[in-house]
Every structure is written in structure tokens, then in C-alpha cells.
């Protein structure tokens, strides 16, 4: 992808890639929610909004195929690619101006009703902007952070913002400002390409400049431009910027919410949160207002699923650092960011449990709540393969990791205390150790003998029987070996010949094949009937062969 795309260029690229639906008829703002809900798997560009100068783009980062496209990789590798890119840094560059300065409104001219405001979900507290990348500097260090936060309309120049998660850096900045008796200067950037959003969600230490990380994702310095009324820099490809004063000295004392969240429910109810004063609005002429789809009847196909690759990256990176041989991490869309799978190659019997502990606690998102770990023979991107491994490789009393009182998102309605949750990990790997027979977990692959040899010499049933007896007499044979040897002969002759020899054959105790050998008894080893037990599927003793 080109570095630092403008939003119009990004829209064109999505259209060319087949990810975009265009709505060319003019619609009212109140029709926007149902229009978006009717197109859950595509980005939607509504070109004309009645009585509004903005067009609307939404659902533009709503599924894992889009993330893979933006990261130029396979969807199974987005987490790994994010970890790799997050290691890079590039110092940002300042430019004098940018398209987001084509329209500048300050002071009394600020009017948020210029935006295409609408009630997204029935019980929302008010209209929200939610494709908001909040940008601020730490009051003590000057280090930049940006992150995505929901923000509710209050008046033409006021908003509320949800910062109830204690680990989020914008909240940390606000509290640091309040401790100094100051408010916090914040820029809200609305509209930008997927790569910018992915970069904003990467887990990095608090002393890391997020725009140096953005440059690492670009592979080139991010270009930044100064705001008009506050001492904050914003990316030069911003479409719309709201320059704000976050009233940190007032505390979290203003109503915000409820809001239809990524859970598909109204998590968190009405909250106490911060108030923002909007000091300036700047944007491009013929602007596109980007909205983040969230909740609704298809919560697994919304822009808030951007958390998925972020969680995958956090988990993949933590597992690698801990020495776990991790191959892939997946946060499935239907798990709404709260479920994650890892495919690993265990080197020791404790690797799976150690991996689960890391998966449940390492992400700055406070997610997932449920983690599962699988062997490398399980395709974690195939839901049926995942369920099959859970069904027969997971034993609840031995393979469960339970951790109480962990951080999570405050929108989880099941939490008795907001932001605090118990978490569970399930070890769905094959057991290791002397007490386990790995052969019992071999998958039952279908037989494919291929084409018979072209120079096959037809045999009678008696000839097959004589040759089969000699073949088994040379060394014990599995039935598959016998079928391969006689492949192309009439199957009735093969089975008939074997039946004529059956009284001369016994079975070896050599798992997993339990081969046939010449013997005067059914078990060609010292075998005594054993009590039925699920721990010994063979139901026989393990005496010498």
C-alpha cells in the first residue's frame, strides 16, 4: 500500500480491490444506520447526504480480508506482520500545510452540526463520532499517543469522550494534566486509511512516540502538520480534525453513553466521563466523513473488529518473546475480540499452559477473556477443525487455566465490577509425557492408493492367497500394506484370499498399525482381557510382542 494515503485515494483503492459499495442516491442522515446494516461485509460510501456537505464512508476496516489487504499479506499472517512492522521506527517530518486545512472554522464558527450526525443504535445516549483517533502529548514527557475512543455529541462545540479504561494512555495523559492543574490539548482526527488505524492499536511501551511507529508501518517518515489553536501535531493525511480542550480539571463528571458497543450490546450503560470543548474544526473541501460501524445485528462485521489484528499481534509477540514456538494466532470474528486461538509447536509439556497465561494477560486491549491453544496440525482458521480439537484434546479438569481479577474492557456486561473479569484458557493440544500414547491422537486420514500399475499381471484368487501368505510371512503387514501390494487386482479376489488365510493370522501389539502376522492365535502376543477403560482404547494388556 502507498504510504500515508489520503482518504479519497484510500476509497479509490478499496473500490479497485472490490471492497466498496457506492450509494449514489441522496439519503437523509436518519437513513444512514439501516443503509450500513444492509451491507455488513463491504465498505460503504454514501455519496450524497441531504442538507450536508459531507459524504459518508463506513465499514472500511470491518473484516480480516481488509486487514490482510492493507498489510499486504495473507490473513493468517496479519498478527505476525504487525509485530514485525511495530519494531521499526521512523522520525516524523513537519509540513507547512495539508488538505485538512482547506476549510478552517474557529471559535464561534465551530459547529458540529455540520457533520452528518445520526443515532446509530436505538438506545444510544446521543449521536456519536467514533472513527476518532485522539492525539495528545504526555504533559510531562511530550511523547505523542494516539488511540481510538468513542465520543458523544453535547452541543455544537462540546463532546463527551469515554476514557473509563484505566490502562488507556489518553486517560493517563488527562490524569497527568489534572495533577498539574491543567486541561489537556487533544486533536481528534476523523478519516484515514486502514494502515493508520492498525498502527494506532499496536501495543508499545508508554514512552514510545506513536507517530514514529506509524512511520515504521509506512516504511517512511509520517508527515505531520500543526493544529491551528492547540500545540498538537496531526498526520497530514487527516480528512477532518477537531481541535479540542479536554477538561481534565473537571474530572470524569459528565454523562456519556450508553452506546451500542462492539459486544453487540449496550455495554457500560451511562458513564461518568470527560467533557471536551471544540476550539476549531478543519477539513478538506468536498470532505468525506468516516464513521466506524459497531454493534448492530452483525457485530462480527463492523469496524470495531479492527481489534482483531491488534490482539493477534499482541499475543503473537508475547508468545515469541517467551520462547513459545508459535506459528499463528487468530482472534475469530464471532468472538468479538474476546476469544483467541494460538497454533504452537510445544517443546515441553508446560508450553501450552504457559502460552495460555500469556494470551490472557499480555494485550494492552485487556482482551481476550477466552484463550485456546492448539497443535500445529490444527487449522485454527477452520472453525470445524477448532471444535473437533476442543472436543477430544481438551479435558476440563486437567487442561483449564483460570485467572481471576484481570483487566478487561468496561463495556463487558457480564462484569460485576467494570473493567475486571475472570479469564479462562483451554489447552487443546495433544498431551505429552510417558503416560500418554501419541498414536491415539493421530488423525484418521482417508485411504488413497492412487492409480494401479500399468504393467499389472492379473492373478487368480488362489495365486493372490499364496502370494499374500508369503508377503505376510516375510514380515508383519498392515492391511494398507497388503492393499498396496495387490493394488489393481480384483477386490473380491483380494478379500477372498485374505479370508482364506484369516485362521493363520494374528495381530501384533505394535501401535498404531497392529499388523497381521502368521500366528496360530488371534493375538500374536501375551494378551489378557482388561477391564474397559477410556485410558486404554485397545482394551488389552501391553505384554511383549
Where are these regions (language model features)?
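Extended, highly charged
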Residues: 1-275, 279-488, 492-494
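Non-catalytic nucleic-acid substrate-recognition regions in nucleic-acid-modifying enzymes
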Residues: 483-544
Amino acid at each position: 500500500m502507498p504510504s500515508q494515503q489520503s482518504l479519497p485515494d484510500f476509497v479509490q483503492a478499496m473500490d479497485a480491490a472490490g471492497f466498496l459499495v457506492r450509494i449514489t442516491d441522496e439519503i437523509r442522515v436518519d437513513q444512514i444506520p439501516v443503509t450500513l446494516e444492509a451491507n455488513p461485509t463491504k465498505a460503504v460510501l454514501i455519496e450524497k447526504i441531504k442538507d450536508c456537505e459531507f459524504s459518508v464512508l463506513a465499514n472500511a476496516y470491518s473484516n480480516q480480508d481488509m486487514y490482510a489487504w492493507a498489510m499486504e499479506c495473507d490473513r493468517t499472517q496479519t498478527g505476525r506482520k504487525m509485530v514485525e512492522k511495530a519494531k521499526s521506527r521512523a522520525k516524523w517530518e513537519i509540513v507547512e500545510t495539508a488538505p485538512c486545512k482547506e476549510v478552517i472554522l474557529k471559535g464561534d464558527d465551530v459547529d458540529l452540526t455540520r457533520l452528518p450526525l445520526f443515532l446509530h443504535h436505538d438506545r444510544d445516549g446521543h449521536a456519536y463520532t467514533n472513527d476518532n483517533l485522539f492525539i495528545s502529548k504526555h504533559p510531562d514527557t511530550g511523547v505523542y499517543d494516539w488511540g481510538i475512543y468513542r465520543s458523544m455529541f453535547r452541543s455544537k462545540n462540546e463532546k463527551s469522550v469515554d476514557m473509563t479504561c484505566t490502562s488507556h494512555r489518553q486517560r493517563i495523559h488527562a490524569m497527568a494534566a489534572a495533577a498539574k492543574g491543567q486541561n489537556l490539548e487533544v486533536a481528534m482526527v476523523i478519516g484515514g486509511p486502514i494502515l493508520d488505524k492498525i498502527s494506532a492499536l499496536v501495543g508499545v511501551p508508554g514512552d514510545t512516540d506513536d507517530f514514529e511507529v506509524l512511520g515504521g508501518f509506512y516504511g517512511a517518515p509520517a508527515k505531520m502538520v500543526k493544529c491551528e489553536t492547540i500545540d498538537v501535531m496531526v498526520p497530514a493525511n487527516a480528512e477532518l480534525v477537531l481541535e479540542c480542550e479536554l477538561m481534565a480539571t473537571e474530572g470524569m463528571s459528565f454523562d456519556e453513553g450508553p452506546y451500542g458497543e462492539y459486544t453487540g450490546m449496550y455495554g457500560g450503560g451511562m458513564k461518568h466521563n470527560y467533557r471536551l470543548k471544540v476550539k476549531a474544526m478543519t477539513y478538506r473541501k468536498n470532505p468525506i466523513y468516516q464513521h466506524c460501524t459497531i454493534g448492530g445485528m452483525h457485530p462480527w462485521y463492523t469496524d470495531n473488529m479492527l481489534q482483531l489484528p491488534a490482539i493477534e499481534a499482541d499475543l503473537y509477540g508475547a508468545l515469541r518473546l517467551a520462547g513459545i514456538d508459535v506459528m499463528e494466532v487468530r482472534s475469530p470474528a464471532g468472538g468479538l475480540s474476546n476469544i483467541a486461538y494460538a497454533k504452537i509447536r510445544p517443546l515441553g509439556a508446560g508450553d501450552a499452559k504457559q502460552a495460555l497465561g500469556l494470551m490472557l494477560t499480555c494485550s494492552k486491549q485487556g482482551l481476550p477473556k477466552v484463550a485456546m491453544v492448539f497443535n500445529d496440525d490444527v487449522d485454527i482458521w477452520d472453525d470445524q477443525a477448532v471444535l473437533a480439537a476442543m472436543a477430544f484434546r481438551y479435558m476440563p479438569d486437567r487442561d483449564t487455566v483460570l485467572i481471576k481479577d484481570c483487566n478487561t474492557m468496561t463495556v463487558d456486561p457480564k462484569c460485576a465490577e467494570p473493567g475486571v473479569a475472570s479469564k479462562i484458557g483451554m489447552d487443546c493440544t495433544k498431551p505429552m509425557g510417558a503416560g500418554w500414547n501419541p498414536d491415539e491422537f493421530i488423525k484418521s486420514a482417508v485411504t488413497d492408493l492412487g492409480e494401479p500399475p500399468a504393467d499389472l499381471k492379473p492373478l487368480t484368487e488362489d495365486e493372490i492367497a499364496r502370494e499374500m501368505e508369503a508377503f505376510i510371512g516375510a514380515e508383519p503387514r498392515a492391511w494398507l500394506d497388503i492393499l498396496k501390494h495387490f493394488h489393481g487386482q480384483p477386490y473380491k479376489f483380494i478379500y477372498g484370499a485374505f479370508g482364506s488365510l484369516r485362521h493363520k493370522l494374528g495381530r501384533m501389539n505394535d501401535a498404531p498399525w497392529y499388523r497381521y502376522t502368521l500366528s496360530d492365535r488371534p493375538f500374536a502376543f501375551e494378551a489378557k482381557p482388561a477391564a474397559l477403560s477410556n485410558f486404554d482404547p485397545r482394551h488389552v494388556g501391553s505384554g511383549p510382542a
